[in-house]
């Protein structure tokens, strides 16, 4: 007997849960941070590839002069991903120690983690503006 239905349910029929969403974004932020570390190492190695530093300075001048808004946005997004990944990592460490394992506490710790990540990212962005002198003391 042949039944016209899938063997296993597809992901689209499930309602997204807070815990699964946080898990997916934790993996995405980890992959993004690993990519940013790789590209930053490659960026700093560009100066070693040329015989003179003229091309490196020319490239760096292009980035800072023409793509300043892009670099600032990328740094802020990377800081947001780092704060989220770090806060969720602390949450996972607390789970490993046996804390917050009840379902209601899992959701509560997820919301607290999200607010901590947003607060840390906001503090980093404010500190970045202060160090550039855009906000007077």
From Swiss-Prot:
Assigned protein family: Belongs to the cytochrome b560 family.
Organism per entry: Marchantia polymorpha (Common liverwort)
Positions bound to heme: 85
Bilayer-crossing regions: 31-51, 60-80, 106-126
InterPro entries: SQR/QFR_C/D (IPR034804), Succ_DH_cyt_bsu_CS (IPR018495), Succ_DH_cytb556 (IPR014314), SuccDH_FuR_B_TM-su (IPR000701)
GO BP annotation list: tricarboxylic acid cycle
Protein name: Succinate dehydrogenase cytochrome b560 subunit
Gene Ontology cellular component annotations, sorted alphabetically: mitochondrial inner membrane
Subcellular localization: Mitochondrion inner membrane
PROSITE patterns membership: SDH_CYT_1, SDH_CYT_2
Pathway the protein acts in: Carbohydrate metabolism; tricarboxylic acid cycle
Subunit record text: Forms part of complex II containing four subunits: a 70 kDa flavoprotein (FP), a 27 kDa iron-sulfur protein (IP), a cytochrome B and a membrane-anchoring protein.
Keyword set, alphabetical order: Electron transport, Heme, Iron, Membrane, Metal-binding, Mitochondrion, Mitochondrion inner membrane, Transmembrane, Transmembrane helix, Transport, Tricarboxylic acid cycle
């Amino acid at each position: 007997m042949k039944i016209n239905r899938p063997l296993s349910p597809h992901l689209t029929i499930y309602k997204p849960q807070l815990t699964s969403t946080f898990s997916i974004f934790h993996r995405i932020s980890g992959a993004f941070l690993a990519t940013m570390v790789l590209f930053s190492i490659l960026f700093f190695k560009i100066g070693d590839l040329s015989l003179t530093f003229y091309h490196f300075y020319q490239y760096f001048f292009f980035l800072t002069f023409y793509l300043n808004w892009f670099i600032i946005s990328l740094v802020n997004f990377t800081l947001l991903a780092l704060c989220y990944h770090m806060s969720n990592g602390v949450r996972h460490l607390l789970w490993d120690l046996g804390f917050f394992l009840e379902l209601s506490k899992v959701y509560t710790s997820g919301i607290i983690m999200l607010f901590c990540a947003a607060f840390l990212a906001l503090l980093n962005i404010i500190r970045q503006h202060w160090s550039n002198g855009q906000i007077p003391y």
